[in-house]
Amino acid sequence: MRETLEALNSLGFSVGQPEMAPQSEPRDGFSNPQEKMSSRDESTLHSCSGPETPGQKEGIHTEQAEAPCMGSQACIPQKAEPASSVPGEEWMIRKVKVEDEDQEAEEEVEWPQHLSFLPSPFPTPDLGQLAVAYKLEPGTPGTLGGIALSGWAPIPEKPYGCEECERRFRDQLTLRLHQRLHRGEGPCACPDCGRSFTQRAHMLLHQRSHRGERPFPCSECDKRFSKKAHLTRHLRTHTGERPYPCAECGKRFSQKIHLGSHQKTHTGERPFPCTECEKRFRKKTHLIRHQRIHTGERPYQCTQCTRSFTHKQHLVRHQRVHDAASRTRSSPDIPATPHPPTASLAPSPTGPKPFACSHCGQSFGWKKNLATHQSLHLTEGRPFGCDECALGTNVDPAAEPSACTPHAPDCGPGSGPVAPQRTTSSERSFFCPDCGRGFAHGQHLARHRRVHTGERPFACAQCGRRFGSRPNLVAHSRAHSGARPFACAQCGRRFSRKSHLGRHQAVHTGSRPHACAVCARCFSSKTNLVRHQAIHTGSRPFSCPQCAKSFSRKTHLVRHQRIHGEAALPASASNLSAPAWSNPSEVVPPPIFF
């Protein structure tokens, strides 16, 4: 109180000295705390200066008090000074300390209740505005602290910040509870998984995940949630509410965390680096997902087969294959595809292909592959149509009869209708400047150009052999591990590459989709077609280093070298000139367009 009065005196208010209540004053005198002490009534005060007894001090009391003087000498009458001359004198109240005579119990009189009915604890206009602006509380010791009000600053909304993660809090208790997370000192541990929490309420909310308790249902759909905040966030998907706008581009988001991640695209911030390589990521989840490439972890496994995946969305997409298969088995009335031989050209090694083309009946395991395939049926940019397969082409059949050769009649026994060869589509807007080949995506063109530049950025960790694409490296690594994940459904034979399986299945189906443009002979694989075309072109790229004799096939060269006393191809054979079509999967356009 003394500090409060001194601060008010420094502001120019005339405030009297604080008066001490007598220690022996009974409690009954303060039975009504709402009595107002009027400073206009003068009363005679007596000063007791007698010898002090233990626990007694010199005090001042009024004549109206029922208790006698504590001193043995005569009391000296004195005039009582006004308690306050401030216009709002009703607000000023003395904080009285009451003691029992035996000094066994002590208590302090709290602020009188009538103060809550006053319009403002600071009646003067200037002080009242300062009290509102600086959030000063009346009666709190050290509220002003003897410092001029001009030296006080407004209290920030969250003044306490964490040094570890830069989060801010309104009070120190919440800050200390939060800092336990960084130190791993959670006092409340989950008995099921051992996870620690700073507060018991958070631990109880977490235990709902173990019990499967979801007490908050969505009124729009059948989903349920364990927290009300999660339900509120989910409801925005139905209402379309996006309350968090980006200040840079105006894009709006339904969650604040999504806005924070989006803003990093403007700042270029990537705070999460990979410890194995030099890549950096905007989200920690992206870093964790990327690190599975280095560790080989595949945490998402299909419950119906043995396949596993690195991403959850890949597992969900894969499970649609099983769902479509179960629907097909449960619905026998589903009509068959119009062209069974075409649809069975490349069956999936892991299950059915639920996405069928409505034009030709060819089936696909993924919907995006079906969309890419259906672009072949577009007539825009293909003015010349084929009478057999209804596919368009850019070449006039009258000028070039072999423009649509897959339907040649002399394709061998059992060939039947074959899959049409894919020609350049109007949607292939990326063309190679070296060979003119077109691609639908820029990344496919960049991958193709490595054939011309000779770039091979992917190296095998076992033997050091390098490859131009990651799929080729993955397929090569199966040669070291012995993995053969692609099995034939007819004979059970297994293969390390899907293309090898498709080529093998042509043996069972009798399909020969690759026809020679010169003699109309058909082949089951494009490799055999390219090898056959060397007969018409006269190409003999494999030459013997000892007699200069050349051959069209490498196996013929190896067999010839046995004449010279060599049982196998010598080590120097690696320096032989390789044929232009030695790797047909890279040089010759593949029959399937991605």
From Swiss-Prot:
List this protein's GO terms for biological process: regulation of DNA-templated transcription; regulation of transcription by RNA polymerase II
This entry's Gene Ontology molecular function terms read:
DNA binding; zinc ion binding
Q: Where is this cross-link: Glycyl lysine isopeptide (Lys-Gly) (interchain with G-Cter in SUMO2)?
A: K97, K368
Q: Print the keywords alphabetically.
A: DNA-binding, Isopeptide bond, Metal-binding, Nucleus, Repeat, Transcription, Transcription regulation, Ubl conjugation, Zinc, Zinc-finger
Name a Pfam family for this protein.
zf-C2H2
Gene3D superfamilies reported in the protein's UniProt record: Classic Zinc Finger (3.30.160.60)
ZnF endpoints (C2H2-type): 160-182, 188-210, 216-238, 244-266, 272-294, 300-322, 355-377, 430-452, 458-480, 486-508, 514-536, 542-564
Q: Which GO terms describe its cellular component?
A: nucleus
- UniProt keyword annotation of Ubl conjugation present: yes
Location in the cell: Nucleus
Answer yes or no on keyword Transport: no
Describe the protein's quaternary organization and the partners it interacts with: Interacts with STAT3. Enhances STAT3 activity by keeping it in the nucleus.
Similarity-based family: Belongs to the krueppel C2H2-type zinc-finger protein family.
Role noted for this protein: Transcription factor that promotes adipocyte differentiation and suppresses osteoblast differentiation in the bone marrow. Enhances the osteoclast-supporting ability of stromal cells. Binds with STAT3 the consensus sequence 5'-CTTCTGGGAAGA-3' of the acute phase response element (APRE). Transactivates several promoters including FOS, OSM and PPARG. Recruits a histone deacetylase complex.
User: Per its record, how is this protein called by name?
Assistant: Zinc finger protein 467
Which species does this protein come from? Answer: Rattus norvegicus (Rat)
Q: Which gene encodes it?
A: Znf467
